[in-house]
């Protein structure tokens, strides 16, 4: 590679007036590019271009701190590409799918190229054509990047790696930090540049973690473009929903007609609030923002004026979960109301369940929420906390590694350890910025023994090796695919796994939630009609399969989806994901298996085309699927509503979202033996989600 470009080379990102050809395609810049450049060239991140390029020239590791609205998520990757003479490849990780897609779309506009060419993206279930060899900058979720590292620990595809929103401390981010530290300290990629970015980050702690790597810190102007007026409560509020709604109504009555954002904890809260607002204030466009929301609805939330196409509105009101805290940009906001809460989950290793609870956000999160305004004009932030409560918030969120199940994360680490052993995996786990709890490690070891994930020498078995190729799934779903392959029902199992993943315990997630986007007959009655028609007496897993099969055999799938209010984008993503799982499990298990595994897999080394076809679908599919579910969910089994693998004496109930409630009375269900995909504690009560009766 020739000498790297500097701030003096006014091409590409450093050519906002578009005076020279675009180095990505050697074509003249469009007028749209020049108009947009008048905006992004004023961002604080652009003003720091010379410092960023100089840091990349002189250091292998660069920390960038900056508040939201600085433009770092879009401009820093372009500066990194500029540093490589537009010949290298830059990858940037982001924590959420919706944010990854938004960043890629805006980045393509800023680069004046078609999305999927020089600018690409990848997340679980995304269009595979968007991530290709033509990409110069790729936006990926943390999980996708972890898989890249597992496949190629040298990260040989990339010249610059950028980690955004590092302060969130998700398990995937902690793994990435460990992997990057291991790679940088090894000296095997002296040419690789790494940038770690965050709005709020403890740079001393991070630099200490990378203590043997030469690094520097760049602080990009932390102040908003415009002043933000901040308000706190005089006394603690008893209901942030009630207090927030009253504040919103007061602002509406003042006839200011400026856009507002209210941070709440769940999509259901967002829907509830918008349903309260719409009838009373028909000139206020209320829109819900949450993870995996409908992409059409999302554009009306993000754009400053696009919602005006939908009706005679004066202002926009956004009800959002914490997905709107960071990289997701909502244009035109003047008011932000922060409830001060988020919905948090933590793993209970005694019963392999999740405890869901509302808790205060960290100060870092609260400041990010405040930073949603003050970008294009002066803003106002209302924290529904007293000043004393605000000052008492934890500085940063608790790392997920201390709160979540680490089963699949340990499998990934074993896979990239030098000799791929359990002992080495544990040793690497203890090198994380915050090592996991011993109780979580013990719970994981118990599952490894139960399902023969590692052998007597601590080496990954065939089961463990296959699991590394599905590491974004929980272990029970991976095992279900493996056992379904053995029992000749892999295609149906792939559909069930994809449906379970996307619906997240609620079959209602397949249907439109909001009445602002439905094309036609999206009433709740239509959804109920479909469920009544297709519901399966075994429960959720088989009902999911039946719904998909009904969709698949329809001659006009779009009309079918519209008729029942089904989200076509969701079921199309399910179909694409199911196909990926199906062909991946076929390709993995058609290879010769490792010898002497106790959890014997079919030896497919001499399979004929007829054998493979028979394994795709058998005559007794339902029985085989049920047996595969039993084998893969041994630790997620309950008898008389008591988890059988739990060390705690607990009793749960079937989630109200399960279709079983529409078939059986409570006293009938309580006598059954079930398997479930998730055990959750909500408001102190345990419930089973995504449930199938096995006897």
UniProtKB/Swiss-Prot annotation:
InterPro entries: DEAD/DEAH_box_helicase_dom (IPR011545), Helicase_ATP-bd (IPR014001), Helicase_C-like (IPR001650), P-loop_NTPase (IPR027417)
Catalytic activity: ATP + H2O = ADP + phosphate + H(+)
Residues that bind ATP: 66-73
The protein's Enzyme Commission number: 3.6.4.13
Limits of the Helicase C-terminal domain: 247-434
Chaperone recorded as keyword: no
Top EC class of this enzyme: hydrolase
Cellular component terms per the entry's GO annotation: virion component
UniProt motif (DEAH box) ranges: 164-167
Xref: CDD domains: DEXHc_RHA-like, SF2_C_RHA
Record keywords, A-Z: ATP-binding, Helicase, Hydrolase, Nucleotide-binding, Virion
Ranges where the Helicase ATP-binding domain occurs: 53-219
GO molecular function, one term: RNA binding
Homology family: Belongs to the DEAD box helicase family. DEAH subfamily.
Protein's name according to its UniProt entry: Putative ATP-dependent RNA helicase L540
């Amino acid at each position: 590679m020739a000498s790297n470009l500097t701030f003096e080379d006014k091409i590409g990102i450093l050519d906002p007036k578009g005076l020279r050809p675009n180095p990505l395609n050697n074509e003249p810049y469009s007028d749209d590019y020049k108009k947009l450049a008048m905006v992004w060239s004023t961002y604080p991140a652009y003003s720091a271009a010379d410092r960023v390029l100089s840091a990349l020239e002189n250091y292998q590791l660069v920390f960038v701190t900056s508040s939201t609205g600085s433009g770092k998520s879009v401009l820093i990757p372009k500066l990194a590409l500029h540093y490589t003479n537009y010949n290298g490849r830059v990858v940037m990780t982001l924590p959420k799918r919706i944010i990854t897609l938004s960043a890629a779309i805006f980045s393509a506009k800023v680069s004046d190229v078609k999305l999927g060419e020089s600018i690409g993206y990848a997340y679980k279930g995304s269009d595979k054509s968007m991530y290709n060899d033509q990409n110069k900058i790729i936006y990926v979720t943390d999980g996708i990047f972890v898989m890249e590292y597992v496949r190629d620990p040298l990260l040989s595809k990339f010249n610059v790696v950028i980690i955004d929103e590092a302060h969130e401390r998700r398990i995937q981010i902690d793994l990435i930090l460990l992997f990057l530290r291991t790679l940088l300290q090894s000296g095997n990629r002296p040419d690789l540049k790494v940038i770690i970015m965050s709005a709020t980050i403890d740079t001393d702690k991070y630099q200490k973690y990378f203590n043997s790597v030469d690094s520097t810190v760049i602080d990009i102007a932390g102040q908003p473009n415009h002043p933000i007026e901040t308000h706190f409560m005089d006394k603690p509020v008893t209901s942030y929903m009630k207090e927030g709604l009253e504040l919103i109504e007061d602002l509406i009555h003042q006839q200011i007609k400026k856009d507002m954002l209210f941070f709440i904890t769940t999509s259901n809260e967002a829907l509830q609030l918008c349903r309260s607002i719409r009838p009373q204030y028909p000139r206020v466009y209320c829109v819900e923002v949450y993870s995996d929301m409908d992409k059409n609805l999302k554009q009306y939330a993000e754009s400053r004026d696009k919602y005006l196409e939908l009706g005679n509105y004066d202002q926009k009101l956004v009800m959002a979960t914490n997905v709107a805290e960071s990289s997701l940009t909502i244009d035109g906001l003047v008011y932000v109301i922060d409830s001060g809460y988020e919905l948090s989950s933590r793993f209970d290793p005694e019963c392999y369940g999740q405890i869901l609870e509302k808790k205060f956000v960290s100060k870092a999160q609260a400041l990010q929420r405040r930073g949603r305004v003050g970008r294009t004009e002066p803003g106002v932030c209302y924290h529904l906390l007293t000043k004393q409560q605000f000052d008492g918030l934890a500085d940063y969120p608790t790392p997920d590694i201390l709160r979540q199940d680490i089963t699949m994360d340990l499998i990934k680490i074993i896979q990239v350890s030098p000799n791929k052993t359990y002992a080495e995996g544990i040793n690497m786990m203890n090198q994380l910025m915050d090592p996991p709890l011993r109780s979580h490690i013990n719970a994981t070891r118990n599952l490894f023994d139960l399902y023969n994930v590692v052998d007597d020498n601590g080496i990954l078995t065939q089961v463990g090796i296959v699991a590394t190729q599905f590491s974004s799934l929980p272990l029970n779903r991976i095992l279900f695919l493996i056992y379904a392959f053995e029992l000749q029902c892999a295609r149906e199992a792939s559909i069930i796994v994809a449906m379970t993943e996307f619906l997240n315990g609620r079959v209602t997630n397949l249907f439109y939630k909001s009445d602002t986007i439905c094309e036609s007959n999206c009433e709740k009655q239509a959804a109920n009609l479909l469920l009544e028609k297709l519901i399966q007496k075994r429960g959720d897993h088989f009902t999911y399969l039946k719904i998909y099969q009904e969709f698949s055999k329809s001659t006009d799938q779009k009309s079918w989806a519209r008729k029942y209010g089904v989200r076509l984008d969701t079921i199309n993503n399910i179909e694409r994901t199911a196909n990926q799982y199906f062909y991946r499990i076929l390709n993995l298990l058609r290879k010769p298996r490792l010898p002497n595994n106790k959890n014997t897999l079919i030896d497919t080394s001499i399979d004929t085309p007829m054998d493979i076809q028979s394994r795709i679908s058998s005559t007794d599919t339902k029985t085989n699927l049920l047996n595969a579910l039993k084998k893969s969910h041994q630790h997620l089994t309950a008898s008389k509503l008591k988890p059988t693998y739990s060390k705690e004496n607990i009793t749960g109930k079937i989630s109200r979202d399960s279709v079983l409630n529409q078939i059986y009375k409570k006293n009938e269900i309580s006598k059954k033996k079930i398997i479930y995909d998730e055990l959750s504690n909500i408001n102190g009560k345990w419930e089973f989600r995504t449930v199938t009766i096995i006897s």
